[in-house]
């Protein structure tokens, strides 16, 4: 094939189509129905490489054009191409590992020569080498609410701090209610707590910083054991920082977007969040609320069981789950298994909201997923289990499958997932690398792309493999902000024709080698797939969260 491309000067997208189709043509079963597949009496769909060699040997421009047009036309049927890639993976080379390493090295050369590494290193840098994986599946917002005792603030049992947050521990027996964190009458008392914590603990025992206290968290004494573990404290307080950003944006332009993203509340004012968090819910023979239940009932040793399950709250507010079910789920301390628990309730599809999708693709911000497999022990999802127009994404600690409608939507969903969880350290034979390839393989092989979209996939691949390697000064590129990350990945310059061809060859071969390595099915799809339904206006449930 390379001889034909060189001899007849086939470049760009046409060359990429010829290379991809040539790799899988032997797996195609052609019916010869239209007879347009024959070139010199040979079916070019099934014997593409042989026909390319004959056309080159004969110097036949006419036959070469027919072959290129046939390859371009065949690639329009992406489902057939994907099936042929899967079939082609049955022929596993004994040198697959060596071939993968070779292709990674070739891609790294393009990464250097195209100036992509230099472009990445021009972004903001930081000194810390690791990050906490964050999403909107759980929250610490309930612990910003102020415990009360007979109309006055409850007595504080212990004090602590984490960075800019003061932490007050309370004896539950001294708490008979909780009120909103923005209650004006208690602002002076909260400021006094901040000053007291700063005076008692000028240096944070967790992070070592000596900054001002900007907010106070109110925790039950039973959480002191959980917070004593550094990893637990880091996970919980990162989410508290996310919630504090939400609180401080009340009344600002970004606040309605955050309300919709985190709680599925649309077109509402700031005070509505208290109706959701403090609204009455039936629980057995009495009433309670999300905030009250979180404070008064124990979780397990897993830090997630002490948080608010935001996904279930969004599902309830979208009308697909009874609000009371949130409390039953929290009572069972199963918060690490959102998706499986919803599946056990016969909800074969889960609903999620993501604001980046309508901004970047013009689609809806409500989308459906179906459960796939729990992501324990760095479980790598198997691309063979995907069906038409589907991609993988991870929700909390669970792999799910989402259906996309356009190539740009698929790139956006994959980029968001990779930004959250993938750490490209330059090593190719690691669990993180295989997770990256499971997501990228679908983009590279299945979706029909133009040069702009392939350039975005190339930058995304470079980030997933090399993007978090330290620079020459030992610092790390700051990829923490999703908006900045998406702009850098999606809005970069287009690759030149030569760069496009070179990187596509390497990415295509890496994708096919990954499919070969994942020949053994690692998981079973839990439920039969259902067609995605279009969601229109969100129907609000009553703010008191009571089920009618």
Curated annotation (Swiss-Prot):
Q: Which domain of life is it from?
A: Viruses
Report the sequence similarity comment from the record: Belongs to the orbivirus non-structural protein NS1 family.
- Output this protein's name: Non-structural protein NS1
**Source organism (scientific name):** African horse sickness virus 9 (AHSV-9)
């Amino acid at each position: 094939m390379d001889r034909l491309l060189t001899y007849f000067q086939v470049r760009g997208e046409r060359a990429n189509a010829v290379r991809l189709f040539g790799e899988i043509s032997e797996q195609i079963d052609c019916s010869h129905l239209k007879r347009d597949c024959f070139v010199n009496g040979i079916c070019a769909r099934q014997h593409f490489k042989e026909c390319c060699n004959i056309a080159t040997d004969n110097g036949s421009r006419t036959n070469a054009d027919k072959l290129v047009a046939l390859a371009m036309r065949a690639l329009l049927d992406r489902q057939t191409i994907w099936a042929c890639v899967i079939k082609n993976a049955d022929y596993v080379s004994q040198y697959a590992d060596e071939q993968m390493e070779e292709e990674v090295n070739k891609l790294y050369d393009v990464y250097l020569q195209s100036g992509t590494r230099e472009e990445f290193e021009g972004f903001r840098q930081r000194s810390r080498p690791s990050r906490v994986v964050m999403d909107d599946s759980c929250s610490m917002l309930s612990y910003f609410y102020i415990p009360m005792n007979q109309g006055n603030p409850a007595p504080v049992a212990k004090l602590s701090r984490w960075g800019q947050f003061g932490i007050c521990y309370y004896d539950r027996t001294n708490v008979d209610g909780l009120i909103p964190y923005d209650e004006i009458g208690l602002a002076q008392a909260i400021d006094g707590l901040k000053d007291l914590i700063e005076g008692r603990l000028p240096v944070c025992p967790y992070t070592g910083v000596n900054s001002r206290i900007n907010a106070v968290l109110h925790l039950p004494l039973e959480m002191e054991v959980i917070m004593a573990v550094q990893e637990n404290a880091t996970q919980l307080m990162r989410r508290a920082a996310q919630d504090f950003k939400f609180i401080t944006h009340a009344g600002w332009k970004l606040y309605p977007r955050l309300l919709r993203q985190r709680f599925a509340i649309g077109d509402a004012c700031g005070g509505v969040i208290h109706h959701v968090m403090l609204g009455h819910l039936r629980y057995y023979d009495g009433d309670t609320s999300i905030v009250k239940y979180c404070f008064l009932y124990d979780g397990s040793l897993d830090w997630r069981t002490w948080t608010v399950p935001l996904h279930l709250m969004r599902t309830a507010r979208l009308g697909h789950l009874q609000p009371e079910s949130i409390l039953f789920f929290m009572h069972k301390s199963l918060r690490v298994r959102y998706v499986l628990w919803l599946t056990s309730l016969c909800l074969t599809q889960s609903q999620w909201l993501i604001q980046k999708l309508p901004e970047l693709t013009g689609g809806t911000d409500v989308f459906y997923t179906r459960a796939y497999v729990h992501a324990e022990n760095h479980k790598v999802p198997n691309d063979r289990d995907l069906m038409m127009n589907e991609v993988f994404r991870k929700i909390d600690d669970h792999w799910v499958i989402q259906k996309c409608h356009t190539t740009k939507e698929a790139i956006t969903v994959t980029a968001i997932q990779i930004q959250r969880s993938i750490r490209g350290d330059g090593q190719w034979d690691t669990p993180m690398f295989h997770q990256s390839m499971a997501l990228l393989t679908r983009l590279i092989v299945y979706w029909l792309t133009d040069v702009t979209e392939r350039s975005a996939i190339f930058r995304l691949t470079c980030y997933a493999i090399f993007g978090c390697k330290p620079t020459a000064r030992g610092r790390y590129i700051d990829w923490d902000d999703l908006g900045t990350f998406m702009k850098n990945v999606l809005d970069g310059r287009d690759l030149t024709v030569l760069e496009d061809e070179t990187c596509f060859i390497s990415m295509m071969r890496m994708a096919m080698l990954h499919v070969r390595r994942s020949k053994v099915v690692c998981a079973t799809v839990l439920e039969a797939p259902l067609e995605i339904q279009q969601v229109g206006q969100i129907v609000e449930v009553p703010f008191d969260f009571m089920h009618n």
